[in-house]
């Protein structure tokens, strides 16, 4: 067993799930818990998590999360976190407030960067200037402006976060389930309560919770662990003796049968937009076998519209959709069923309907094949670890969670034995017993009713503005040359092009049908087809049976539209109908068989299909309405892009406001038979005639097997139409505002711009030198930035209390950047931070898709090298010239905003048209 001076090693163990070794330690002086995850992952990660348990709705821990990153003893600058964002090579850099903990993680492939970041993070959390500077508290938490209005970054963020009916319902549900513990409070802060937080209480809470003996530190990846532990000990932990007894969470007496009726204030209350949430406790956090069993059980019974419990509940026609929620990261895990699109009368019938459906399932028994499929799917996800978070960041969060609730930071990093144990229980009736135990108690219930609002419901430190001084700052020389893409091969086979890139581990098999010959109005129907496929039968299987087969044999399977444009001037748009499959190599034959049946044989006409269309289209409309409130900046950006290039227009038609209008039109017509005929005709034309590229990311053995399977599959065709560019007419730019519920705004200004990789440096300067200060720190928006896409650039704000003021700030940006002086160190920071994003490590599935994207768009390693070279050539003169030239460009840009009724009406002169969504 290794020895580390200053630490006591508790245990060391192999961990196949992490492809390495785990070591748990305690720091002798401070009592800090430390977990080492040693493996060969070069995307090294660090995380420090504190147990933080709110006692009110002031959001004190959320404000602290923001505040500690705003300057520290060693780094006494206004915004060290922002300076790291613009100059670091990190693949992940953030902080997160959870209901019971606050975690500060990062990941980076660069050793020097890792040491810099670790020191900045540790100095921030243990020695923040915010404890002696109330200005940070006022900026990040709350303050009153000259006119008496309350503002602040967290205050404004939470106004947006709590604007949606979903967020308000969830908070009410937590209060009903946990009336006496920390989980009953809004950890992010309720705007109604945030102004009650004083600076003195904020300081007291920090001192009690941000101590070394109330933290868990994780070091992950390929690194010199002894060196990192020595730094931790010497610079921080050895100087922090154990405090008094650390704060602890308490268990809540369960509240079966608790009922809350909650109004949701909206200017346009509709009687069929009532929501009803039912929730149950699922047992002890430490019983990881049981909690994984709950996850698998919910997947088997509720994952799709055809899953037995969800299908039975939808058949009662109580509402438009039913969502599930399961949180097993808290001391008392919970599950939730949420009925959407209901009336008051139907919502009151939801709990009895659930009881009835569960009882019926218990009478017949849960089908074994459903449980096996859900278990396989969960196990594949555990192995693949999909999503964008680096593995080390996930481990740091999980380590903090396990340590917090059980004292064992390694608890959540071991899963193999859990899956093995549950697999052995499939035949024992264990899951039936679990189902009975979960749903026997009366649920906690929250009924949310849209309601028109009533009138009364309307709503000295040592610091410098200088640069962050690191011991070993990164320069352009640290960038390296970038990794070359794996060399692929292409060959004709069975009427298709077979593309293969070598890879080990999971297989990724993607089928791309060219849509170059599709009319623009048909693209929306194809997109809808990808949304409804899960709900449709085939001649051989019901939708439920086919979904079970997919989960049993495939790790992931989805149909989607892909829209890609090359980098060259005037490059065409490549539109594809795509079937994406991820699997283990032993399942390749089944994958081809199941994928072919799912895509080709689903029955698109008839009574069953028509019922599915009515159900799914209604669900999609509801989900888009929720997303307008939560992610308005994305919809605004999509709308703006539609005016300038074909890919943007096609994307907006399939994911933006135009698609929402399309769904509303279908619901209004309710001619589901005609819809089925249309979908069938469009699908037949594409699958039978369109050029097909089959992309395999896998071994040579898998390629040989696929060469045998493909000619005998549904994907084979004697002849296909050659691929061609997708075209669509563009509409003239229009300044538009869309009114949404909620008290925040999402403002976008976009303009066309020929691709030039050097402009990405300008975007980074704009984001972190001007917008961050003007829009976020002064204006109080939660997020802001400048983005460069191929052919278009735009400025945006996110959860912004302002609308007109932000557009004014956009207009002032060019002059502010052009007047700024740029030192050699400034340029190094901007260039390093920008160029590093070209090489952000990707997980296997994302890496496979990126290689396919490069193939279709003709992107070569030489092009990427040229981008890197161009970035590194940016100098001060170019930056100032680019900034100055922006003034004329911005004045001709298009404005698109999603915002509150009051904000939009106060700035309606900025827009050519206004629409209420």
Name each model-derived stretch.
Residues 58-70, 523, 527-531:
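Active-site recognition of the HExxH zinc-binding catalytic motif
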Residues 92, 203-207, 264-266, 309, ...:
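Generic recognition of flexible, low-complexity loop/linker segments
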Residues 427-454:
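Extended, domain-scale alpha-helical bundle/helix-rich regions
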Residues 43-53, 79-127, 134-140, 167-192, ...:
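M16 family metallopeptidases and their MPP-like homologs
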Residues 1-45:
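Non-catalytic terminal extensions that flank enzyme cores
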Residues 37-40, 47-49, 155, 159, ...:
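His/Glu-based metal-binding/catalytic segments typifying zinc-dependent metallopeptidases
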Residues 144-212, 218-221, 225-233, 240-265, ...:
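Hydrophobic, small-residue-rich alpha-helical packing segments that form membrane-like cores
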Residues 200-235, 651, 655-656, 675-710, ...:
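Non-catalytic, conformational "gating/processing" segments within enzyme and secreted inhibitor domains
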